[in-house]
């Protein structure tokens, strides 16, 4: 089962939490769910260059709070915050609610599964050899603290007549272990020969406590430790 299912969906409520966090009446649920899909599609299209990892949507009473996790927050914010204000106004019009927009920087894009998949897809579109792109991504992830990584590329790789699937793995990726903190991401490369799919699994260690927010808290703590160690180096 762990080999087939989306690893994030399998761990929801155990050591992962949902990206849409709100409750609704039966009559409103469908409308709000459709709104979430539209918000994500709009932001993904609008901020293609911003390296977006994930979009979290929360809905306090008659409000909407959107949190964008991005490796390039400067592109979203713009000069003196002009771009982020335009985005906020567009989102308010889409939701018909008072919308706030938060940006969270992804400090280690090399171990974020979605960003790795996007990077490989962009390289395939630029005709970089798929094996080289995969190997480079694996080496970067292992160097920056991942305990294991697996990458699948499928489609007409290198312009081959027959589509196939190639994969590369290093370290451990225990898909069946529920306490494993596994990040998963996908991307599509639109090449001259057709679409190639990229899937990435990153194993970041084990979470022993039963806490749906554990994975997020761990990422934030890791960022803080990284920034404090950088400050210590600068002071030295």
Swiss-Prot record:
Chain positions covered by the region annotation Disordered: 214-236
GO BP annotation list: translation
Residues in KH type-2 domain copies: 39-107
Classification via PROSITE patterns: KH_TYPE_2, RIBOSOMAL_S3
InterPro entries xrefs: KH_dom (IPR004087), KH_dom-like_a/b (IPR015946), KH_dom_type_2 (IPR004044), KH_sf_prok-type (IPR009019), Ribosomal_S3_C_sf (IPR036419), Ribosomal_uS3_bac-typ (IPR005704), Ribosomal_uS3_C (IPR001351), Ribosomal_uS3_CS (IPR018280)
Known partners and oligomeric status: Part of the 30S ribosomal subunit. Forms a tight complex with proteins S10 and S14.
The protein's name: Small ribosomal subunit protein uS3
Gene, per the UniProt record: rpsC
């Amino acid at each position: 089962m762990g080999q087939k299912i989306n690893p994030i969906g399998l761990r929801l409520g155990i050591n992962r939490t949902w990206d849409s966090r709100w409750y609704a009446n039966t009559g409103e649920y469908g409308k709000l769910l459709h709104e979430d899909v539209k918000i994500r599609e709009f932001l993904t299209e609008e901020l293609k260059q911003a390296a977006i990892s994930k979009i979290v949507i929360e809905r306090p009473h008659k409000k909407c709070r959107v949190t964008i996790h991005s490796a390039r927050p400067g592109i979203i914010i713009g000069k003196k915050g002009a771009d982020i204000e335009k985005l906020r106004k567009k989102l308010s019009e889409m939701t018909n609610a008072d919308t706030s927009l938060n940006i969270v920087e992804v400090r280690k894009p090399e171990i974020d599964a979605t960003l790795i998949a996007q990077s490989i897809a962009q390289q395939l579109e630029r005709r970089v050899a798929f094996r080289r792109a995969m190997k480079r991504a694996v080496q970067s992830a292992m160097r920056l603290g991942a305990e294991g990584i697996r990458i699948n590329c499928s489609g007409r790789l290198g312009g081959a007549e027959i589509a196939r699937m190639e994969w590369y793995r290093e370290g451990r990726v225990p898909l069946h272990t529920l306490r494993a903190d596994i990040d998963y991401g996908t991307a599509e490369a639109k090449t001259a020969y057709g679409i190639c799919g990229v899937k990435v699994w990153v194993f970041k260690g084990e979470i022993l406590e039963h806490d749906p927010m554990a994975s997020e808290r761990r990422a934030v703590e890791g960022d803080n430790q990284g920034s404090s160690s950088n400050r210590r180096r600068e002071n030295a």
